[in-house]
Amino acid sequence: MQQETGIHPIVQCDPIAAIATPLGVGALAVVRISGATAFDIAGRVFRKARDPHQPLSETPGYTAHFGRLYDGLTLIDEVIALVFRSPSSFTAEDMVEFTCHGGPVVTRHVLQLLLDNGCRLAEPGEFTRRAFLNGKIDLLQAEAIGEMIHARSESAYRTAVIQMKGDLSATLGALREKLLRSCALLELELDFSEEDVEFQSREELRVEIASLQSEVARLVDSYQHGRLLTEGVATVIAGRPNAGKSTLLNTLLGEERAIVSHMPGTTRDYIEECFIHDKTMFRLTDTAGLRETGEEIEHEGVRRSRMKMAEADLLLYLLDLSREGMAEEIKEIVALKAAHASSKFLVVANKIDLVPDATTLLCRLGEEAGCEAIGISARQKLGIDELKSRMSSMVEGLDKLHEASVLVTSLRHYEALRNAGDALRNAQNLLDEQADTELIAFELRAALDYVGEITGKVVNEEILHAIFERFCIGK
């Protein structure tokens, strides 16, 4: 079910508590409370070192107080209490954050103390969800917080920070305002239909819709690069059996992740792992060797390998340079490169340490295959730094994309914008056909709702649940 959200008064909900820092041994940990009776609950268990009789409810916001937590007469810990008053807190509710000593036992004691005194254990992402529902952040910014927490590369982190700052929200807000204006003018016409009044000429509307289509199309197109920043560059290592694909995966990762054997066909299914080079994350996939086989399990592995190759942003074809008779394999390389024209393609010639005239063979290989070939020895770790640099250069500028413009990085946002673009296209076609105003207004309203879904102006409970369940309990 969807509903339109607007500016609502701050709602103080039931008090929730959670540990906001990772469980483990450390110097400090944070346990937070938020809700209508947060100050009352904190006041029952916390005594200030100075002026112990002054309740926290009487202290100003944005203040820190040293004191002790007690369970009755039993000392739990010495803590710092940070006070945040509604509406000037993260959730817009009254909040208290206790900074206690780190360690799982003491942290759990502090949390249990708050639960025993009236708090409910927060659900995953509930603090952020309350911030969204109380208008402190929009849905895009809430998602950006989650993306920043889960970021695995510098590029993903920087992109999340920019989204959290509100750049994409501002772009979509301006887009929504234009849509809202056109919708309002058309609906005014419907209200005054008996008077045959045009509040916006059809030519002006046509120009406006064309401009909106262009803006939406730019955002849709940006997803192709934006997803690489957050998801990483899908990099598939392909080639014949026993070319050294698993050894190369292990060498790039710096760990023994894949089983390595001299027996062909050891890898039966693909293996995925990530590594970061020059701030760019690569999602490496080691695939089963490409060959015709009657063995059922290996045949399925080859089928899955080809499926992953079709999804690759960067395809590394690994060739055993020490193997005799490369002519047939070169034909396969040429065919693969043509079949995966949308992917970056690099031939990696392995086992150069076993070939005396490796440089000559590499030149010949590059000429006959019609593409660049780079020589390595995965086992001896020769040429690996050069390979990593070449991989980064093939996606050059990716780490700076987040600085250049507003990017769409989420599949949810991408699909909503595609739907908005379809609705705008329908509206433009209806205009060309001189269709009824009501039909044009319907399509513009649909586009408006799709854009609203991204920022949370239009709320779908299933979407909210899917977004916030990914958060940790204390966020």
Curated annotation (Swiss-Prot):
Principal EC category: hydrolase
**Annotated binding of GTP, by residue:** 242-247, 261-267, 286-289, 377-379
Q: Tell me where in or outside the cell this protein is found.
A: Cytoplasm
Q: Which cofactor does it need?
A: K(+)
Give the EC number(s) listed in the UniProt record.
3.6.-.-
Q: Which GO terms describe its biological process?
A: tRNA methylation; tRNA wobble uridine modification
* Keyword check for tRNA processing: yes
Q: Which residues does Mg(2+) bind?
A: 246, 267
UniProt xrefs under InterPro entries: G_TrmE, GTP-bd, GTP-bd_TrmE_N, GTPase_MnmE, MnmE_dom2, MnmE_helical, P-loop_NTPase, Small_GTP-bd
Annotated GO MF terms: GTP binding; GTPase activity; metal ion binding
Q: Which UniProt keywords apply?
A: Cytoplasm, GTP-binding, Hydrolase, Magnesium, Metal-binding, Nucleotide-binding, Potassium, tRNA processing
According to the record, cofactor stoichiometry and binding are noted as:
Binds 1 potassium ion per subunit.
HAMAP family to which the protein is assigned, alphabetical? GTPase_MnmE (MF_00379)
Oligomer status and interactors? Homodimer. Heterotetramer of two MnmE and two MnmG subunits.
The protein's name in its UniProt record: tRNA modification GTPase MnmE
